[in-house]
Amino acid sequence: MANWPRCMLKHVIGGWILIGWSLGSMALAQNPRVLLETTKGDIEVELFEKEAPVTVANFLSYVKKGHYDGTIFHRVIDNFVVQGGGMTADMKEKPTSDPIENEAGNGLKNERMTLSMARTSAPHSATSQFYINLKYNRPLDRKYSQDNFGYCVFGKVIKGEEVVDQIAKVKTGRVKGNGDVPLEPITLKKAMILEGAAAAPVADTPKDSPQKDK
């Protein structure tokens, strides 16, 4: 490096300064985090606001309205997913806001412990229901999905993986016509924003929506 022209050294040093400043800015800009208090323990999730802005804003809106409080994890399939966010303890679906755009093309994968949106067979039908992947479910990624749309990943579990794994092992059966329902209800007692989400808007007036089914 001693033989490089001085002007080149200037650019290199300047580049390192710029990179260092950028990394510092990234450290300051933290992703939103949400705590899910369940009857099996607490689960903390980090939301990928940059990669899935519409989906994250939608999820935070439901959190702020208290939509998730008192809902159950109504679909549990070991080695696949834990799903919740839309059903009451008596297996009635809660009213939701309008469906959102499917952001599954954001490059994120349905890897173990990622947080994704459930939907019907219609690609842009996600509302409030979400699921946590219990393994890498590659067929749910846009690149490998049969419908060429896939299921949007918008966050990941950063604390409480053992709680998710515990939920995955509960006994399930058919309840009021629905399969894979925990026979002992697992309740999401409360969802609360921990940080980084103060600016998320509250969605419009809720309306009825079809049952979400991944």
Can you say where each PLM-predicted feature lies in the sequence?
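Cyclophilin-like peptidyl-prolyl cis-trans isomerases
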Residues: 24-214
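N-terminal secretory signal peptides that target proteins for export/translocation
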Residues: 1-10
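Bacterial N-terminal signal peptides
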Residues: 10-25
